[in-house]
């Protein structure tokens, strides 16, 4: 059920003077690298007076900072979780017309909270996309099977890299926050799905479980590895990804992951702690990875010449 509208969202507050000088964690990258970014942007909630973080949680307080952050980062692919339709439209506006979003709401009518992929179409062409419900009937909107009280989804896009000729698959998801059984079964479903894909794969999202959890172990026992664990450079000193509107915290749980197939080279990866104007754009922090896969063009070899037999 969609919560009542936060009427304060109609008049967004300014993030403050000088905030246009945001220093990104990664920022735009050139070929053959791709900048992948996953971010739980925290759904717009009705305001409950007197609750902790009530002011920090206001969408009207967070939106200007969130816009500045994603405008500075401009990833090749941005996976978002928890966005309501109006929030998705505002983020798409911040990214501009070079980006195309694919995704759907999790509910039976395909409305409500969504996971989405925002793709930079100057670099990547969307070949196809689909929504999957994390259930025994993945093609049935709103379906639930694993013990979660609300539907959970994933979105898969097949992309052509216009710079390298490679074709890759990107999946974004949001696992259940209450049921460990649901998370485990969802991980099995996604691992089975991605193991069957042909070509490079990235899986990103909010998994509501830490590194080393059953869900993480299940997803990384196939073709996928955790980008932060294999990166040449780590972008954070050991931060968790759920800071709950506070500063980034060393030793916190990393609930948000960015997984890639073992054939990828990960230049750098980690949690971003940018606070435009001192404002935390969400209760989660984004996770980034700079990744490159072998070029399809480089892999092509001329046919070996064999002299005809006499």
Predicted feature residues:
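Surface-exposed cleft-lining segments at the edges of enzyme active sites
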Residues: 51-55, 138-146, 172-181
